[in-house]
Amino acid sequence: MKQKILVLGGPTAVGKTELSIKLAEKLNGEILSADSMQIYKKMDIGSAKVTKEEMRDINHHMIDIVSPEEEFSVADFKNIGEKAIKEIIAKEKLPMIVGGTGLYINSLTCNVTFTESEKDDEYRTYLESLAEANGNNYVHEMLREIDEISYRDIHPNNRKRVIRALEVYKISGKPFSSYNAGNDFYKTDYHVFYYVLTMDREKLYDRINKRVDIMIENGLIDECIELKKLGYTSSMQSMQGIGYKEILYYLDKKISLYEAVNLIKQGSRNYAKRQLTWFRRDPRCTFLDKDVLSDKEILSKIVDDITNN
């Protein structure tokens, strides 16, 4: 019998954290965060990082594992995450992958290949200079010409991954997206139970807007001031995260606070839309609509599925 793994995905602000804690308590689980911002130390408010109080003594993995100045790839996440899963299984507990970063989830639950060994430093430097001179959208549009799937899947602000996709195509002549295509993509040693929380779009957007306001009230600006004092700049991968880059623009007097807050809200809403598009393309996902099912019903369904299958 295959080892069970529970995946709980969904867009930002849909309510994954609270449900995941309740599930871990019911199913004797430990949580592995699949969130591309919660990996960073010192970046708590803008990433909506789960607090010690919210954890309620449930072990969490893949949170606060790298410093803001460090580069961190999906391959890095896979390497560390696989070790964490083995540790959880060794304790005879249920591994629970919780988050909204689809690439991170797939790295642990799919037959994913990374092409990190092939590099062209000269071409990469050239692309970096293009992005610096013309903006991230410029190199992102270059990707459209050679790899429509990667163009659609990779956000323009994920400059590192956009450049990697262009680099891989130049080296191999094959689209970056083709490395993980094929019938064996979803083949895994685990029995994956994959659930995605959804709700009415307008309700979700309202929750997102309110959460951004709460982040500002809770000290996001002060958090960014401290990060800036420590020498972290907007050019770093971590500082490209929604909420951080906008406040840094404000602190650099490039935009007003009003503009920064509205950009964070718009960016978060757009991100939620992209997340849902990602999950809808995955045939493994069972969607649980919070407008149709109560929190108690959702909890009960997942617990029953895991327990009885």
From Swiss-Prot:
Which chain positions carry the site (Interaction with substrate tRNA)? 101, 124
Q: Which InterPro entries match?
A: Dimethylallyltransferase, IPT, P-loop_NTPase
Task: Give the residues the record marks as binding ATP.
Answer: 10-17
Q: Which domain of life is it from?
A: Bacteria
Question: Pfam families this protein is in?
Answer: IPPT
Known catalytic reactions: adenosine(37) in tRNA + dimethylallyl diphosphate = N(6)-dimethylallyladenosine(37) in tRNA + diphosphate
Keyword tRNA processing: yes or no? yes
Q: Which Gene Ontology molecular-function terms are recorded?
A: ATP binding; tRNA dimethylallyltransferase activity
EC top class, in one word? Answer: transferase
Q: Where does substrate bind?
A: 12-17
This entry's Enzyme Commission designation comes to 2.5.1.75
Question: Which keywords belong to this entry?
Answer: ATP-binding, Magnesium, Nucleotide-binding, Transferase, tRNA processing
> What biological processes does GO assign it?
tRNA modification
Cofactor(s) listed in the protein's UniProt record = Mg(2+)
What's the family? Answer: Belongs to the IPP transferase family.
Q: Which HAMAP family match?
A: IPP_trans (MF_00185)
Subunit composition? Monomer.
User: What functional role does this protein have?
Assistant: Catalyzes the transfer of a dimethylallyl group onto the adenine at position 37 in tRNAs that read codons beginning with uridine, leading to the formation of N6-(dimethylallyl)adenosine (i(6)A).
Name of protein: tRNA dimethylallyltransferase
* Lineage, opening ranks: Bacteria, Bacillati, Bacillota, Clostridia, Eubacteriales
